[in-house]
């Protein structure tokens, strides 16, 4: 008996399919071909020879018509009939890239009928179909189901459930690669008197193992859902029956892609390992090109290796071995109930997550604000006074990403600042790499895409990649293991933030509070270094006032050690004032020091060019009454703005045109001598001389400013 090969093209797919019929070519009819394919809703076109046009595609609809044969084989094209819906599965066969590849079985998982039941499923046909590609078996199963539904002999009932009533039985796993575990639960699909590890479909061992896999995985997922219900009452009305477990099988062609492109996350608890999950998907890999696997999906099986009873370490080792082998890779994953990974894998970036000392912050708040409001502060901007404050709350709305006009000529720091903002669109979150958590990391390909779409001037994506490489070389972004070459598949974190914190303002620049609006949050210099230049219309030191009726007397700011409560350097070792005992000794040894003050010479080392937050009328008589009242006055007028400029004291001169206010001569004392240090360097004072209510808060504030990413706020 002869054999006929039939090559057929399915719709617009590039790769043809091959079936063999145990009939000679001159006896093969359309009915024989349809009997093998079982596709009644398709139109059949065959390669034939026309006398006028030559080789054409001829449509044949008569089942008894002989099929045209060329060189001992038949070439056919199958086209879906217009308006026909052969299968209710939610995909279209016109687009082969969207077809979920199933397991390579034509009978369907869980089909209760043995393979011998199907007509035209002889030994040769079944063998060749099994060796066919997955898409062939997919469409075969797709067309097989409506035909079964038509005949009355297929309306049998299984455990009291009609076959027609539950078309998304495990047979549906073959056509749409999905299986709803809740439907398995609500139907008596498995024999209750059999062992848990077996099913009634003993004739199909591969399919029953998949059924066991899905049932065990559903049991594990149910335990996790119960724990969530205990933590949150909002899930109390949701039961396991409403949380459908969607399992898909994806076959990836590794010939087109260089890498798989996934990172896996292992979950463990006191009861053991809790499974392998997809942590993130890298762009450019095989998984990203397929598009069906998402972060949060649970990895159940790779090729023929089941991860069910395997530890996380063994699963990682097996996955690495499979990836390095040539050939396609088949992944069986359970879709997560919420496909968005933000809710379950990440922490909010807008709130701090690292612990600090709340008592120190409370005392700092009380000491810095006192009983008076902070002068020059805008009510629309939050101050750094509580544990819930964040760096992002100090950024005015005018500095959001939409207002950044970024181009390739912009400063790199400005571009990185816009990239680091929470509204930038760059996905920055905790990543898992080799079981090491990398906090606030992002993928190199995301950086390139962000630059290409948000920075003007790039002609193509290659230039954006070069710019990202320059960001790495400049230190604005860093590799997790400090590699200097940029790769789109690697994780990166932002560089040192201290340089960018100088751009964050704590005030509205509306001119309502004079020069105090120029205060900015910036890193403080070393105690031995001179302070940076101030942003003022006149340079340091300030010129003497033209009207000075008492040149021999210093101003009130040094009366009886008033600087003891003034702002200090954040290091706690420098102060803008001096203690009383040292001032008294200097008064006896250097009575002419006050004259040098009025001359405007470089000896004014303890003066700054800051405009005073306290006007002349605010200089209460309590300042001249004694040390205690003086310290209280300084603390009460000490605002957050002056604390951030902690290396400066209160100014020497009042507003322009207004003479300084002087007290009685017997209450005056000269300032420290000029030989204490270079111009601009504040004199030294030990931290022990700081009032006790300020010591703890300053230590905490110093630690927070010195380690902004560790203590202050989760910026990135």
UniProtKB/Swiss-Prot annotation:
Residues 422-496 form the DEP domain. Residues 213-226 have a biased composition (Basic residues). Residues 85-235, 546-691 are annotated as: Disordered. The keyword Cytoplasm applies. Gene3D superfamilies: 2.30.42.10, 2.40.240.130, Winged helix-like DNA-binding domain superfamily/Winged helix DNA-binding domain (1.10.10.10). Pfam families: DEP, Dishevelled, DIX, Dsh_C, PDZ. One of its GO terms (biological process) is positive regulation of transcription by RNA polymerase II. The modification Phosphothreonine is found at residue 346. It is found in: Cytoplasm. The modification Dimethylated arginine is found at residue 698. The modification Symmetric dimethylarginine is found at residues 271, 342, 614. One of its GO terms (cellular component) is cytosol. Residues 249-321 form the PDZ domain. Changing residue 614 to K: Localizes to plasma membranes. CDD domains: DEP_dishevelled (cd04438), PDZ_Dishevelled-like (cd06717). The modification Phosphoserine is found at residues 48, 125, 192, 697, 700. Residues 142-156, 582-595, 604-622 have a biased composition (Basic and acidic residues). Residues 175-190, 199-212, 565-581 have a biased composition (Low complexity). The modification Omega-N-methylarginine is found at residues 27, 212, 342, 698. GO terms for molecular function: beta-catenin binding; frizzled binding; protease binding; signaling receptor binding; small GTPase binding. Residues 1-82 form the DIX domain. It is linked to Robinow syndrome, autosomal dominant 3: A form of Robinow syndrome, a rare skeletal dysplasia syndrome characterized by dysmorphic features resembling a fetal face, mesomelic limb shortening, genital hypoplasia, renal anomalies, and costovertebral segmentation defects. Interacts (via the PDZ domain) with the C-terminal regions of VANGL1 and VANGL2. Interacts (via the region containing both the PDZ and DEP domains) with LRRFIP2; the DIX domain may inhibit this interaction. Interacts with CYLD, CEP164 and DAB2. Interacts with DCDC2. Interacts with FOXK1 and FOXK2. Interacts with DAAM2. Involved in the signal transduction pathway mediated by multiple Wnt genes. This is Segment polarity protein dishevelled homolog DVL-3. It comes from Homo sapiens (Human).
């Amino acid at each position: 008996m002869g054999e006929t090969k039939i090559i057929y093209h399915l719709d617009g797919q590039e790769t043809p399919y091959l079936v063999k019929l145990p009939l000679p070519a001159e006896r093969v009819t359309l009915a024989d071909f349809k009997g093998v394919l079982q596709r009644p809703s398709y139109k059949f076109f065959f390669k034939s020879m026309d006398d006028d046009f030559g080789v054409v595609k001829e449509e044949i609809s008569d089942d008894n018509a002989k099929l045209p044969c060329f060189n001992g084989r038949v070439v056919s094209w199958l086209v879906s009939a217009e308006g026909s819906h052969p299968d209710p599965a939610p995909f279209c066969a016109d687009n082969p890239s969207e077809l979920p590849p199933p397991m390579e079985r034509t009978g369907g998982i869980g089909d209760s009928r043995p393979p011998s039941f199907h007509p035209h499923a002889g030994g040769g046909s079944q063998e060749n179909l099994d060796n066919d590609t997955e898409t062939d078996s997919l469409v075969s199963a797709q067309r097989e189901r409506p035909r079964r539904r038509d005949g009355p002999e297929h309306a049998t009932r299984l455990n009291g459930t009609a076959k027609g009533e539950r078309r998304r039985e495990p047979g549906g796993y073959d056509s749409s690669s999905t299986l709803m575990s809740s439907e398995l639960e609500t139907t008596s699909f498995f024999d209750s008197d059999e062992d848990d590890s077996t099913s009634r479909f003993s004739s199909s061992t591969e399919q029953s193992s998949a059924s066991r896999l899905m049932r065990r995985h559903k049991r594990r997922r149910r335990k996790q859902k119960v724990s969530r219900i205990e933590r949150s009452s909002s899930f109390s009305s949701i039961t396991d029956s409403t949380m459908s477990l969607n399992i898909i099988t994806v076959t990836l062609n590794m010939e087109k892609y260089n890498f798989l492109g996934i990172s896996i996350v292992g979950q463990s608890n006191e009861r053991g390992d809790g499974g392998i999950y997809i942590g993130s998907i890298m762009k450019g890999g095989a998984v990203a090109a397929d598009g069906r696997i998402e972060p949060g999906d649970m990895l159940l099986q790779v090729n023929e290796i089941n991860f069910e009873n395997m530890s996380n370490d063994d699963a990682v080792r097996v996955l690495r071995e499979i990836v390095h082998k040539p050939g396609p890779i088949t992944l069986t994953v359970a879709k997560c109930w919420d496909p968005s990974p933000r809710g379950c894998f990440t922490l909010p970036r807008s709130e701090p997550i690292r612990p600090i000392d709340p008592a120190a912050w409370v005392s700092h708040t009380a000491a810095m604000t006192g009983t008076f409001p902070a002068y020059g502060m805008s009510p629309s901007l939050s101050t750094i006074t509580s544990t819930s404050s964040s760096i992002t709350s100090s950024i005015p709305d005018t500095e959001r990403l939409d207002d950044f006009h970024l181009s390739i000529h912009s400063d790199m720091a400005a571009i990185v600042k816009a990239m680091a903002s929470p509204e930038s669109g760059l996905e920055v979150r905790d990543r898992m790499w080799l079981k090491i958590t990398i906090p606030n990391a992002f993928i190199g390909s995301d950086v390139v895409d962000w630059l290409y779409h948000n920075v003007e001037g790039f002609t193509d994506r290659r230039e954006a990649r070069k710019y990202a490489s320059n960001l790495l070389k400049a230190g604005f972004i860093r590799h997790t293991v400090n590699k200097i070459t940029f790769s789109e598949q690697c994780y990166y974190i932002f560089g040192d933030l201290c340089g960018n914190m100088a751009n964050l303002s704590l005030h509205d620049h509306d001119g309502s509070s004079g020069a105090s609006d120029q205060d900015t949050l910036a890193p403080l210099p070393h105690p031995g270094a001179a302070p940076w230049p101030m942003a003022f219309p006149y340079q340091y030191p300030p010129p003497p006032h033209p009207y000075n009726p008492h040149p021999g007397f210093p101003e009130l700011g040094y009366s009886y050690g008033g600087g003891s409560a003034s702002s200090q350097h954040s290091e706690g070792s420098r102060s803008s004032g001096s203690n009383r005992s040292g001032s008294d000794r200097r008064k006896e040894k250097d009575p002419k020091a006050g004259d040098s003050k009025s001359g405007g010479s470089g000896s004014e080392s303890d003066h700054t060019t800051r405009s005073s937050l306290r006007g002349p009328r605010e200089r209460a008589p309590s300042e001249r009454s004694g040390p205690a009242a003086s310290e209280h006055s300084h603390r009460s007028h000490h605002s957050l703005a002056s604390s951030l400029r902690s290396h400066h004291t209160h100014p020497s001169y009042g507003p322009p045109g207004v003479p300084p206010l002087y007290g009685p001569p017997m209450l005056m004392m000269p300032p420290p001598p000029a030989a204490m240090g270079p111009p601009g360097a504040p004199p030294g004072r030990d931290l022990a001389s700081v009032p006790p209510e300020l010591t703890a808060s300053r230590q905490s504030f110093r630690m927070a400013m010195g380690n902004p990413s560790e203590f202050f706020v989760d910026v990135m």
